Amino acid sequence: MAANIQTYLENIRKPWGQIYYDILFAQLKDIKGKRVLDFGSGFGLVANHLAKENQVLAVEPNEEMVALQAQDHPYQQLVGSLDQIESFEDASFDVILCHNVLEYVEDRKVVLKEFTRLLKPGGLLSIVKHNEVGRVLQTVVFENDTQKALDLLAGQDLETHSMGLAQAYDLDRVVEDLALEVQDYQGIRVFYALQDNRFKGQEGWRESMLKMELAVCQESPYRDIAFFQHYRLKRS
């Protein structure tokens, strides 16, 4: 297994990796009885969770991640990228998920145009993306690396531990000429990434921090300083 994939998997299994999914699943709880496309499905954690009450198709280009996929509930898994979905009929899906993917894509517009084609009118596009303010806060407070934070402010891409360079982007600009309208956004990782990891193994930490994150995830200014932002867009 490639070292970066192993690091990513180990991080997900830590309390600070698990709570990300606790928060995300709470924000996706209204998705039931839908046909769902999870584009860039990774280890399949979100696809597997939603497959309990939905018909889910997952697409992931990394074969190592697919080999380690979670599949407690039945869903279809394809290995690939746009090549796997270009043959699908128009308006094939009620919901499309694209979580922490577009930072690593060269031509985001091409991907989003394809999502627009595949979504039914009124359908939901769920995008989780890095938030530049949250990036800088974590770098200064948790990592204590002011030079790296200054580099981020100057426009330098973020070097992630497992997935390489993550390039920030303006979602409003990317979708401005598409039939996609931002409905709302929520924060993920408002507080927990700013804490020292030694606190995160304490009994009850995950449960209490989840309550705190969910209490503010829909509120400004908290959602505006989160490391991740979860956008919901509607297909017009």
Named regions from a protein language model:
Residues 184-236:
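A C-terminal cap/extension of S-adenosyl-L-methionine-dependent methyltransferases
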Residues 86-95:
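A short acidic, Gly/Pro-enriched loop at the edge of an enzyme's catalytic core
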Residues 95-107:
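A short SAM/SAH-binding and catalytic strip from SAM-dependent methyltransferases
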Residues 43-84:
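Class I SAM-dependent methyltransferase SAM/SAH-binding core
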Residues 1-32, 45-49, 65-68, 126-152, 196:
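Conserved class I S-adenosyl-L-methionine
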Residues 109-124:
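A short glycine-rich, Lys/Arg-flanked "PGG" loop and its adjoining helix->strand segment in the class I
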